[in-house]
Amino acid sequence: MEEKKNNLKALRAMRGQTQEEAGESVGVSGYVWGKWERGVSFPDVIEIKAIEEEYNVSYNDIIFLNNNTV
């Protein structure tokens, strides 16, 4: 799950978003998004679907996105 938390940060950084902006874009708070980035909790299936749609990425992209992208 380490990859997922880093990749969420990378997706957010590519757009120049704050955690609050990223969270709001997928229907959660910035606090929740931050917990995902830190690996404290993880998005559920519905939230992953929202991330896929908002960021135009697949589940595999979320998991395997190259961390050098940031």
What kind of region is each of these model predictions?
Residues 1, 10-16, 24, 31, ...:
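Short, charged recognition helix plus adjacent turn
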